[in-house]
Amino acid sequence: MFENKKVLILEGGGFKTSFSAGVMDAFQMQAHNPFDSYIGVSGGCIAISYFLSKRYGYFYQCMRTLCQDERFVKYSKAFTEGLMNLDFFYDIAYKEFPFDFQTAMQSLKGKEYYIVLTNSADGATEYHQPTLENWVDMTIAASTVPMLTKGKHVVNGIHYSDGGISDPVPVKWAVENGATDIVLIRTTHHNFKPSRLRPEYFASKFIRANQKIKDDVENFQNKIKESIDYIDALPEHIKVDQIAPKVVLNSNIFTNSVKNIELDYRTGLEAGLNYIHSVKAESSMLKTH
């Protein structure tokens, strides 16, 4: 599937994906798109959608708008509809910062894009290629976490939840399907360590879904650490370039402010530009030898 292809993978992270928005805008700014395949997890799917749509700055501006609107995050709705109102997010996205789906489909000609989803019935991970007709529904489903959002979303008659629940960093899946050249954009910092003082651990205690999803949400951070350890242990012929913040980001999954989003976005923008510079420097060095 991914043999001889350059694969771009984006981790999710709620408002932490303002970092990813910065990286992707740096890529757009420098017309850097050598990728053959894209894999999106949770909010990473939104970043990829705007990137493929060639909507520079839209995801960043959308998050700035949402964090200032009390209708998006409501603590009073945590046990009924979820902390974050995803339907409101897509209403804002459509009206003020719309995707250009025709351009996105054009960008994917000869390429492939997979959205990571968790089947709400059995907790299994599924990897789907969106069509023009179901792109929005798949992206909503990919960001739907019990308690933090409404919990599940229907796509083609099947209930799905956030793919990050079951596979938050799908490098192993990519490698198992032939990938040897991967760029991973993370929202967890370089020295990430699991902690129980996190919203997803708290949320797991109130989930009434099947036991696998409950366990996966509770162990979400351990699964990220396992993925990082897996990457570190890969053989030399499998290349994984990681673009990640050096320290903990200012934003959290659902806690936010315009200042924090701007800081994380600028950190991502700088990280993206630095990565492109390093790629060009490496390419230039190879040409001279």
Specify the residue positions occupied by each region the protein language model found.
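Catalytic nucleophile serine of serine hydrolases
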Residues: 42
